[in-house]
Curated annotation (Swiss-Prot):
Substrate binds at K128, D160. It comes from the Bacteria. This is tRNA (guanine-N(7)-)-methyltransferase. It comes from Clostridium beijerinckii (strain ATCC 51743 / NCIMB 8052) (Clostridium acetobutylicum). InterPro entries: SAM-dependent_MTases_sf, tRNA_(Gua-N-7)_MeTrfase_Trmb, tRNA_methyltr_TrmB_bact.
Length: 219
């Protein structure tokens, strides 16, 4: 379903102190931009920001980068993140929000940026064969992530889609990642501290089991 236009979104984003208008300027300089050496966690496709809002507001010792492409969802993410920080009486000093085509993620991140963890939550499964290269877990994407993901850095991947999950396992293996953890039923697993996204809640209410894995970049 296409999201309705939100004329307020772009002006709000441009006036937001944690929205990065031109992220390409900071390629190789994200630690300098944050102003500290805290580890960097990256969410690819942050949607309405409910996942990022919880993680970033509860973990001040980690720097977070949240990426999506459309102003409409980024505007909602901005509001949700602000609300979470306000509830904890915290400044939004460890989170950056930006618009970027994820297929071109190397435009804004390089090996100097040293990302410790990547979150990929309920990305588009692109089921047609001719579209599979667009998947955020496809080999082509994983090779990009490897350039800025640190040695033994991790990718946390959640999906409702069985085919995407199984084929992603193959992608991770082919790209030289090691599967550190895997479950085909996240909500009945031993995983602690899971933060649900809006899609995750919706699929769970429909009785769909959530698949989850942690893939680690080997040395």
């Amino acid at each position: 379903m296409r999201m309705r236009k939100k004329p307020w979104a772009r002006p709000e984003l441009e006036g937001c102190d944690f929205f990065v208008i031109n992220p390409k300027e900071y390629k190789g300089k994200w630690k300098e931009f944050f102003g500290n050496d805290k580890p960097i966690y990256l969410e690819l496709g942050c949607g309405k920001g409910t996942f990022m809002a919880v993680h970033a507001s509860e973990n001040p010792d980690i720097n977070y980068i949240a990426i999506d492409i459309k102003d409409e969802v980024l505007g909602l993410a901005k509001r949700n993140i602000e609300k979470a920080y306000e509830e904890k009486n915290r400044k939004t000093d460890n989170v950056k929000l930006m618009a970027q085509e994820i297929g071109l993620i190397s435009e804004i991140l390089s090996e100097e940026d040293v990302v410790s963890r990547i979150y990929i939550n309920f990305c588009n499964p692109w089921p047609k064969e001719k579209h599979k290269k667009r998947r955020l877990t496809h080999m082509r994407q994983l090779e990009q992530y490897k350039t800025f993901l640190k040695s033994e850095g991790e990718i946390y991947f959640k999906t409702d889609d069985d085919e995407l999950f199984e084929e992603s396992l193959e992608y991770f293996n082919e790209a030289g990642f090691r599967i550190k953890y895997i479950t085909y039923d996240l909500h009945n697993s031993d995983v602690e501290g899971n933060v649900q996204t809006e899609h995750e809640k919706m699929f769970s209410e429909q009785g769909i089991k959530i698949k989850f894995l942690i893939a680690m970049k080997d040395n």
